[in-house]
Amino acid sequence: MAAISTSIPVISQPQFTAMNEPQCFYNESIAFFYNRSGKHLATEWNTVSKLVMGLGITVCIFIMLANLLVMVAIYVNRRFHFPIYYLMANLAAADFFAGLAYFYLMFNTGPNTRRLTVSTWLLRQGLIDTSLTASVANLLAIAIERHITVFRMQLHTRMSNRRVVVVIVVIWTMAIVMGAIPSVGWNCICDIENCSNMAPLYSDSYLVFWAIFNLVTFVVMVVLYAHIFGYVRQRTMRMSRHSSGPRRNRDTMMSLLKTVVIVLGAFIICWTPGLVLLLLDVCCPQCDVLAYEKFFLLLAEFNSAMNPIIYSYRDKEMSATFRQILCCQRSENPTGPTEGSDRSASSLNHTILAGVHSNDHSVV
């Protein structure tokens, strides 16, 4: 009998059921997970939380309005009915969704987090993961499209509308899957010892995977744009020896350089700190990552606000369409190219092609 009684405590270990399966905590409160991870769960609004929430809501509104303007501009102006602009519109849609996700977060954070259930907390985080993954995937798709276009010496790719739709569907499918993975099982609800400090219901392994996935995507984008720039610079220098307009070539090269620096700089500034913070949360237990979490979250949010400016507002034709929409004006010539856009080669793809075809001043 003594031998039998000593085996009973082994069967009733707190983390395992009688069937030797891990114990799950689906019915626990959010406070339970936050207390275990050591993350402070506010009971009332302090000054910093109010400032962060106010700034976050303001940025969310700007994100939604700016990206809605981009989508409407691409829809109403037939000059933008090309694959690159469809991808830009999809990028705007992803960033618009990011604005909605952050807007939902702002009203379910701070003391309001206590009211969430496990399911609603995972939904809140899943919306953010989905929107941010879609934005990054769209940036990568645009980089690949520009790379193909430049090296084939085309103004626009010959990709059919059907293929563009397939690319967009793949982007959103991947984004939804990435956002849903924690909700369908890759979390720490049944592995309570491996919960993240920053995201108390997320598994450390998932956050490492998600951070590395985005950092690898960033590296691929850097390589693609560096390859584009190197190719255009080489072509420009070669043609300047046989062209009567070397000054134009230098200006085109500098314009491309500025655009690439803005694109890559915005991505680095907005994304890298938060992704590194996720890795530090897992790999550096002594690091106080929670002290910087809210600020880096806002920084990542700013990327969705910058994308319309970087990819669209530098285009003079896009700017003119913005003014027409905001002033409720009708386009005088919705089907043909404008003289201004012909002269300036204002969009990013016009700029790239101008460097390749330095002797051809007609880009349409």
Curated annotation (Swiss-Prot):
Location in the cell: Cell surface; Cell membrane; Endosome
Expressing tissues: Expressed in many adult organs, including brain, heart, colon, small intestine, placenta, prostate, ovary, pancreas, testes, spleen, skeletal muscle, and kidney. Little or no expression in liver, lung, thymus, or peripheral blood leukocytes. Detected in lung fibroblasts from bronchoalveolar fluid from patients with idiopathic pulmonary fibrosis. Detected in bone marrow-derived mesenchymal stem cells.
Protein known as: Lysophosphatidic acid receptor 1
Transmembrane segments: 51-75, 84-107, 122-144, 164-184, 205-225, 256-280, 295-315
Stretches in topological domain Cytoplasmic: 76-83, 145-163, 226-255, 316-364
List of residues binding a 1-acyl-sn-glycero-3-phosphate: 39, 124-129, 210
PTM annotation (Phosphothreonine): residues: 351
Family to which this protein belongs: Belongs to the G-protein coupled receptor 1 family.
Positions of post-translational Phosphoserine modification: 341
GO CC annotations, alphabetized: cell surface; cytoplasm; dendritic shaft; dendritic spine; endosome; GABA-ergic synapse; glutamatergic synapse; neuronal cell body
Membrane-related topology note: Multi-pass membrane protein
Entries under InterPro entries matching the protein: GPCR_Rhodpsn, GPCR_Rhodpsn_7TM, LPA_rcpt, LPA_rcpt_EDG2
Extracellular side: 1-50, 108-121, 185-204, 281-294
Coiled-coil boundaries: none
